């Protein structure tokens, strides 16, 4: 369960990074 949670957090942070990067690219 904990491993799954950590993987989920990892995925979320990756998505957030991608969103930030695309935001910077737009500006």
Swiss-Prot record:
Keywords: Antibiotic resistance, Leader peptide, Plasmid, Transposable element. GO terms for biological process: response to antibiotic. This is 23S rRNA methylase leader peptide. It comes from Enterococcus faecalis (Streptococcus faecalis). InterPro entries: ErmCL. It comes from the Bacteria. This peptide is involved in the control mechanism of the synthesis of the erythromycin resistance protein. The gene is ermC.
